[in-house]
Amino acid sequence: MKLPVAVLVACAATVTASPSFADAKSEAKSQVEFGINVAQRGLWREAIYRWQKATELDPSYAAAYNDLAIAYEHEGQLDKARKAYEKAIELDPNNTQVRQNYELFKEINDRTTKAKEK
Protein backbone atom coordinates (compact mmCIF):
# COMPACT_ATOMS: atom_id res chain seq x y z
CA MET A 1 0.00 0.00 0.00
CA LYS A 2 1.45 3.34 -1.05
CA LEU A 3 0.93 6.36 1.16
CA PRO A 4 0.38 9.73 -0.43
CA VAL A 5 3.38 12.04 -0.29
CA ALA A 6 1.42 14.56 1.81
CA VAL A 7 0.87 11.93 4.51
CA LEU A 8 4.57 11.07 4.56
CA VAL A 9 5.52 14.74 4.80
CA ALA A 10 3.04 15.23 7.63
CA CYS A 11 4.49 12.22 9.46
CA ALA A 12 8.03 13.52 9.02
CA ALA A 13 6.99 16.94 10.30
CA THR A 14 5.38 15.35 13.34
CA VAL A 15 8.48 13.32 14.14
CA THR A 16 10.86 16.26 13.79
CA ALA A 17 8.61 18.47 15.92
CA SER A 18 8.21 15.92 18.68
CA PRO A 19 9.76 16.63 22.08
CA SER A 20 11.99 13.56 21.86
CA PHE A 21 13.56 14.85 18.63
CA ALA A 22 14.11 18.27 20.20
CA ASP A 23 15.53 16.62 23.32
CA ALA A 24 17.95 14.56 21.21
CA LYS A 25 19.17 17.68 19.38
CA SER A 26 19.59 19.50 22.69
CA GLU A 27 21.46 16.55 24.22
CA ALA A 28 23.67 16.32 21.12
CA LYS A 29 24.57 19.99 21.51
CA SER A 30 25.40 19.39 25.19
CA GLN A 31 27.63 16.47 24.22
CA VAL A 32 29.47 18.63 21.65
CA GLU A 33 30.02 21.39 24.21
CA PHE A 34 31.27 18.88 26.77
CA GLY A 35 33.57 17.40 24.12
CA ILE A 36 35.03 20.82 23.38
CA ASN A 37 35.63 21.37 27.09
CA VAL A 38 37.49 18.10 27.61
CA ALA A 39 39.45 18.45 24.35
CA GLN A 40 40.73 21.82 25.55
CA ARG A 41 42.11 19.97 28.56
CA GLY A 42 43.81 17.38 26.35
CA LEU A 43 41.31 14.59 27.04
CA TRP A 44 40.93 13.59 23.39
CA ARG A 45 39.53 10.10 23.96
CA GLU A 46 36.77 11.51 26.12
CA ALA A 47 36.11 14.16 23.48
CA ILE A 48 35.83 11.45 20.82
CA TYR A 49 33.34 9.58 22.99
CA ARG A 50 31.23 12.73 23.47
CA TRP A 51 31.26 13.67 19.79
CA GLN A 52 30.41 10.11 18.75
CA LYS A 53 27.49 10.26 21.16
CA ALA A 54 26.39 13.58 19.63
CA THR A 55 26.38 12.06 16.13
CA GLU A 56 24.30 9.14 17.39
CA LEU A 57 21.79 11.50 18.99
CA ASP A 58 21.64 13.80 15.97
CA PRO A 59 23.05 12.21 12.81
CA SER A 60 22.54 15.50 10.94
CA TYR A 61 24.83 17.53 13.26
CA ALA A 62 27.68 18.53 10.92
CA ALA A 63 29.65 20.37 13.63
CA ALA A 64 29.81 17.19 15.70
CA TYR A 65 31.34 15.32 12.75
CA ASN A 66 33.82 18.15 12.21
CA ASP A 67 34.89 18.08 15.86
CA LEU A 68 35.09 14.29 15.74
CA ALA A 69 37.32 14.51 12.66
CA ILE A 70 39.67 16.92 14.42
CA ALA A 71 39.93 14.58 17.40
CA TYR A 72 40.53 11.53 15.21
CA GLU A 73 43.22 13.48 13.38
CA HIS A 74 44.84 14.45 16.68
CA GLU A 75 44.83 10.81 17.77
CA GLY A 76 46.34 9.62 14.48
CA GLN A 77 43.17 7.85 13.33
CA LEU A 78 43.40 9.35 9.86
CA ASP A 79 40.93 7.11 8.02
CA LYS A 80 38.28 7.86 10.61
CA ALA A 81 39.15 11.56 10.44
CA ARG A 82 38.72 11.61 6.66
CA LYS A 83 35.34 9.87 6.88
CA ALA A 84 34.13 12.26 9.58
CA TYR A 85 35.23 15.31 7.57
CA GLU A 86 33.48 13.94 4.49
CA LYS A 87 30.30 13.33 6.48
CA ALA A 88 30.40 16.87 7.87
CA ILE A 89 30.76 18.28 4.36
CA GLU A 90 27.97 16.05 3.08
CA LEU A 91 25.68 17.39 5.80
CA ASP A 92 26.72 21.04 5.49
CA PRO A 93 28.41 21.60 2.11
CA ASN A 94 28.50 25.39 2.51
CA ASN A 95 30.30 25.37 5.85
CA THR A 96 33.60 27.09 5.08
CA GLN A 97 35.17 26.14 8.43
CA VAL A 98 34.62 22.43 7.81
CA ARG A 99 35.92 22.76 4.24
CA GLN A 100 39.04 24.61 5.45
CA ASN A 101 39.69 21.99 8.13
CA TYR A 102 39.33 19.19 5.58
CA GLU A 103 41.56 20.90 3.00
CA LEU A 104 44.26 21.45 5.64
CA PHE A 105 43.91 17.82 6.75
CA LYS A 106 44.37 16.60 3.16
CA GLU A 107 47.32 18.93 2.55
CA ILE A 108 49.16 17.77 5.67
CA ASN A 109 48.46 14.11 4.94
CA ASP A 110 49.59 14.46 1.32
CA ARG A 111 52.88 15.99 2.50
CA THR A 112 53.32 13.27 5.10
CA THR A 113 52.61 10.54 2.56
CA LYS A 114 55.08 12.03 0.06
CA ALA A 115 57.75 12.33 2.75
CA LYS A 116 57.31 8.67 3.70
CA GLU A 117 57.63 7.62 0.05
CA LYS A 118 61.08 9.24 -0.27
Regions inferred by a protein language model and the residue ranges of each:
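Helix-start (N-cap) detector for alpha-helical repeat units in TPR-like alpha-solenoids
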Residues: 28-29, 62-63, 96-97
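Register position in tetratricopeptide repeats
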Residues: 40-41, 74, 104-111
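Conserved structural position within tetratricopeptide repeats
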Residues: 53-56, 89-90
